[in-house]
Structure formats: structure tokens, C-alpha cells
């Protein structure tokens, strides 16, 4: 299942990401149509490393072992969808 709605992505926030630690925002990948959670404003197509680190930590806490790629946007999209799937199946 893809993260296609803000509500689904918010499930990630409810899983332990603290919105008070940074300015939270969602961006939509125009190619895949998936929402991606990020912090602050992306610079070009790059996403802040902070958000990737937080998402990776949440994945580890949820027992999700993910390979990372050189494409930060793709990696975060995969993490978001994996976490949402994990939450819905738990």
C-alpha cells in the first residue's frame, strides 16, 4: 500500500516522530504520487538528512530492516510506506 493521503502519512508521526523538534511538512513526489515526510524545506530535490535518520530509527524500533539507496527521496518514500504497512498490520 502506498502512502497516498496525508492521514496515512500522519500515522508515521503518531508512531513516534515529534513534530515539536522541527518544522514538519509533507511533499508529494510528482513521479510516484506518494507523500514523503520531511523537515524544513527541501533544497531542490534533496531531503534533509535529519528526516532520513529519524525515519530509519523508527524503522529499527519497529523491527523493519531496510536497505538504503543513494536516492534519499526514494529511500524515505520506501520507509514511509513500510512504516505505514507495519502499523496497519500490527
Predicted regions span which residues?
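Glycine-rich anion-binding surface patch
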Residues: 1-90
Amino acid at each position: 500500500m502506498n502512502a497516498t493521503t496525508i492521514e496515512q502519512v500522519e500515522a508515521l508521526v503518531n508512531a513516534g516522530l515529534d513534530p515539536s523538534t522541527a518544522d514538519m511538512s509533507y511533499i508529494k513526489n510528482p513521479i510516484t504520487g506518494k507523500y514523503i515526510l520531511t523537515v524544513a524545506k527541501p533544497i531542490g530535490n534533496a531531503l534533509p538528512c535529519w528526516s532520513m535518520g529519524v525515519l530509519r530509527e523508527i524503522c529499527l524500533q519497529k523491527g523493519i530492516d531496510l536497505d538504503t539507496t543513494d536516492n534519499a527521496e526514494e529511500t524515505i518514500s520506501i520507509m514511509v510506506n513500510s512504516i505505514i504497512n507495519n502499523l496497519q498490520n500490527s
